Amino acid sequence: MDTWKFYDITHSRHVVCNPTNEAKLGRLVELLQLAAGADVVDIACGKGELLLRLAEAHGVRGVGVDISPFYIAEAERKRSARVPEAEITFTLMDGAEFQPDAPHSFTVASCIGASWVFGGHEATLDALTGMAAPDGWVIAGEPFWLREPPEEYLRAAGLTRDAFGSHAENAEAGERRGLELVHTFVSSGDDWDTYEGLQWYATGEYVRAHPDDPDLPELRERVAKDKATYLRWGRDTVGWSIYVFRCRPG
């Protein structure tokens, strides 16, 4: 089954494709207080919700990058409907291959919930710091361990113990790079339940509407496995947060 088709189906009901909520995203947008025309880059932008809200609230310019053709198409549709005059572009590409026109040229550089693009949280912070201007913002969304992960969970989820750090370790990774941690938006159990539950719901609706899709057996199997892993271990083992860092002034 095509990877991006899978995520398009399972995340079809999500506005934000991460285990956070729209209220927290709105608070992040309000917190930033960006000037009109500020330049923003969002790596692995999903359906473009962060960029669109920043354009609506502050009149920013920006580029969103994502490897999913389904998400880029949805982001373009939303841009045309909500901010048709905004200088916002969405680009279909691997975020790791994105190269800004100049280093340290963006007021905001973000990668929320997709550190796998760069090979982990610390590498993501390195990449974003290289894009962010002096006194700019580096924003990362990242899981963290709530407790020592059971071996059964690691096997079921296909993870290793060093896949994530603690909440404090995620924050300290930015501070070691000279970034100032100014805020975190930590997800609740309800945020996680909504994120996971919408995937189950969307899958069920898709199965009912497309009974002849040859990908249904794989789709059902993957979602059922992920559901069981989440309910047995994941909900009590993995947290998630948006980390908001400020760069040093020039």
Tell where the protein language model's regions lie, with residue ranges.
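Short, glycine-/aromatic-enriched active-site segment of Class I SAM-dependent methyltransferases
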Residues: 143-161
